């Protein structure tokens, strides 16, 4: 009997690192996208927490009137925010080493730019990591495609909109009330409620919520009972079981009789594709709408579009919205300008002396 012994070459450190990074046996999959995702998201999260607690006021409008956003400077969880980078910086890349001092960097809102850029890179890598793990497991790529909707929305409000408006100071503040302020000002300046892409986004979000609730309630109402009346119906399911856990025929029949026959899906796969696609496509359109309004391609303007035979204006709902827009525009950045541009009929008089 002859034994053949084969010497196994020791794998290099780099090879072992590559195998570990791409292994699907790890408790949490890392992947090559994860190599970039982990440090960028850790950086964004750490700076956000520190700045939300202790960042000094920021000169957001570039007029030497700083705005406080952190907890230690008088805010609470609702009013607090990471104040956007100053209008004095505009779209300039503003890392710490570009400022004369850390105090100057903080005064000009440097943390906002740092957080936003690291966050966008991190969530983009998270999307790539979803695709990478799906690829390694032999799955289809639709999880990453669905996640592209919130990535597109975040990119639109944090990057595309500031680029279109010419300054990171126009980006969305990182806080609860700051988000509401961004929405109000956006409506005042771009009439987003009258933009068709925003309407599609609203249909996507609310429609997705409705369809999700309908699907969940139908499934829960048509479970195949495997337990007694004294036990929870949930105890009748075992992870990985081959048999169906609910009766799709019963659910289909119920919904078909509740609405009409063809309103109900008879194919579970097409149903779940629809549940995923509806909100994703809606949010894609919203992100596209934000990106177009960033360059001032705004919502529809039907102001004073209805007149009587004498030429007098008959107010419509569009005129009410326009009046609200003007009021909101007057109120925001009230120290940065004396009069909103929409209300200025003539050029400002020259001042001599």
Swiss-Prot record:
UniProt-listed Enzyme Commission number(s): 1.10.3.9
Biological process annotations from GO: photosynthetic electron transport in photosystem II; response to herbicide
Propeptide: 345-353
Residues that, per the record, bind [CaMn4O5] cluster: 170, 189, 332-333, 342, 344
Modified residues (Phosphothreonine): 2
Root EC class: oxidoreductase
Positions annotated to bind a quinone: 215, 264-265
One GO cellular component term noted in the UniProt record for this chain: chloroplast thylakoid membrane
Other observations noted: 2 of the reaction center chlorophylls (ChlD1 and ChlD2) are entirely coordinated by water.
Summary of the function given for this chain in its UniProt record: Photosystem II (PSII) is a light-driven water:plastoquinone oxidoreductase that uses light energy to abstract electrons from H(2)O, generating O(2) and a proton gradient subsequently used for ATP formation. It consists of a core antenna complex that captures photons, and an electron transfer chain that converts photonic excitation into a charge separation. The D1/D2 (PsbA/PsbD) reaction center heterodimer binds P680, the primary electron donor of PSII as well as several subsequent electron acceptors.
Protein's UniProt name: Photosystem II protein D1
